[in-house]
Regions:
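Glycine/small-residue-rich loop that forms an oxyanion/phosphate-binding "nest" at active or ligand-binding sites
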Residues: 1-12
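Catalytic cores of large soluble enzymes that bind and process phosphate-bearing ligands
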Residues: 6, 75, 169
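Conserved acidic, metal-coordinating active-site core of Asp-based
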Residues: 11-13, 17, 21-135, 139
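Mg2+-dependent phosphoryl-transfer enzymes with acidic/Ser/Thr/Gly-rich catalytic loops
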Residues: 106-188
Length: 188
């Protein structure tokens, strides 16, 4: 398995910057668990547990004995792009913010994204990125849509995904991925 973690000093620098933004809710994602502070709204913690099955509530992020893989932020949806831009400027050289949609922002390591993961998988399977199809709707899909041979935007995709994609399909509520795969297979 391919795992890339933040250097602890870099992670601490990122945390220091993130903790200055009052309009966000922060979750630290580790290899063993995800972590939120005891001061996090209990309703948000309940929601987070739907997505992070191993979630620890901690007094301080300083006490985490785990490899930090990414930071997940929730913010008001209407503030997402503004916060992404603020983070992009303040985290230069440390991390890259990317919107995963609906007021969610991931803070990831530079160069470690879905396209990099597909490249690694392709290398193992001897499949070039240009032979792959990928589907996406959020900013965290952008590099992947750009790098594969056929990038497909979902109907609900963010505008930058739609302008980057080679093709389009309906949303996941109407089986958009399945319909597109069926179409590809029928054309062969």
């Amino acid at each position: 398995m391919f795992v890339n973690k933040f250097d602890r000093i870099v992670a601490d620098q990122i945390l220091a910057k993130l903790e200055t933004i009052s309009t966000i809710s922060l979750l630290v994602c580790g290899r063993l668990s995800a972590y939120v502070l005891t001061t996090t709204n209990p309703e948000q913690v309940r929601t987070m547990r739907n997505y992070y099955h191993h979630l620890e509530v901690v007094k301080s992020y300083d006490n985490i004995d785990d490899d930090i893989l990414k930071f997940a932020i929730s913010c008001p949806p209407e503030k997402t792009e503004e916060i992404v831009e603020v983070l992009r400027r303040s985290l230069v050289g440390l991390a890259e913010p990317t919107s995963s949609g609906h007021g969610d922002i991931d803070i990831i390591q530079p160069g470690i994204n879905k396209a990099a993961g597909l490249k690694k998988l392709g290398d193992l399977l001897e499949i070039d990125l240009k032979q792959m199809v990928a589907f996406g709707d959020g900013g965290n899909d952008l590099e992947m849509i750009r790098e594969v041979g056929l990038g497909v935007a979902m109907a609900n995709a963010q505008p930058k995904i739609k302008t980057t994609a080679n093709a389009f399909t309906s949303d996941n509520e109407t089986q958009g991925v399945l319909k597109f795969i069926d179409k590809i297979l029928l054309e062969q």
